[in-house]
């Protein structure tokens, strides 16, 4: 870990988040979030950063991905039970804003075949883009299952108008080591995006959905 967050602090916080959680069993799988508060940053003037980083362990097991595919990709998706739609199914939505919005809500992310990806704005309008879910490209030399896993384990940092961010870095069924490693990757990547690195970080916390925040920095 970078010198600013000691290994002990990190493990202690992770243990508190994971095992503090065992006192109360929830009916759902709680996500663990990394919450970041920034300083010396002017969202109006300074460049708003965004970046994605792939974590080692999938932070959100329930994260759903839909393939918008050509015939070959749809057949592949069907064989491995991955949700998919072909161009005809997309055309049936008829650019209806409500239906496109519903589609964007139904899945967390999309992958699209090369032949389809360029046509998506024309077929669906701007709906997926507005929802921040424009599909990533899926080529025929990529393994579909591996690509879906990659999308599931990738998190995005995006600076908006406010000085705090939160991203999912794991869930409460992970081991201490898995969660520590994910947080380590996420924090180092985030700090590398900041103009003045650690000088822009006011505070870092981790917390489970229903748990108390634990301060890392």
Swiss-Prot record:
There is a cross-link at residues 118, 161 (Glycyl lysine isopeptide (Lys-Gly) (interchain with G-Cter in SUMO2)). The modification N-acetylserine is found at residue 2. InterPro entries: eL8/uL1-like, Ribosomal_uL1, Ribosomal_uL1-like, Ribosomal_uL1/biogenesis, Ribosomal_uL1_3-a/b-sand, Ribosomal_uL1_CS. It is found in: Cytoplasm. It holds the Pfam family Ribosomal_L1. There is a cross-link at residue 118 (Glycyl lysine isopeptide (Lys-Gly) (interchain with G-Cter in SUMO1)). Its main location: cytoplasm. It comes from the Eukaryota. The keyword Cytoplasm applies. Keywords: Acetylation, Cytoplasm, Isopeptide bond, Phosphoprotein, Ribonucleoprotein, Ribosomal protein, Ubl conjugation. The modification N6-acetyllysine is found at residues 91, 106, 118. The modification Phosphotyrosine is found at residue 11. GO terms for molecular function: RNA binding; structural constituent of ribosome. One of its GO terms (biological process) is cytoplasmic translation. GO terms for cellular component: cytoplasm; cytosol; cytosolic large ribosomal subunit; cytosolic ribosome; extracellular exosome; focal adhesion; membrane; nucleus. Component of the large ribosomal subunit. Component of the large ribosomal subunit. The ribosome is a large ribonucleoprotein complex responsible for the synthesis of proteins in the cell. Belongs to the universal ribosomal protein uL1 family. This is Large ribosomal subunit protein uL1. It comes from Homo sapiens (Human).
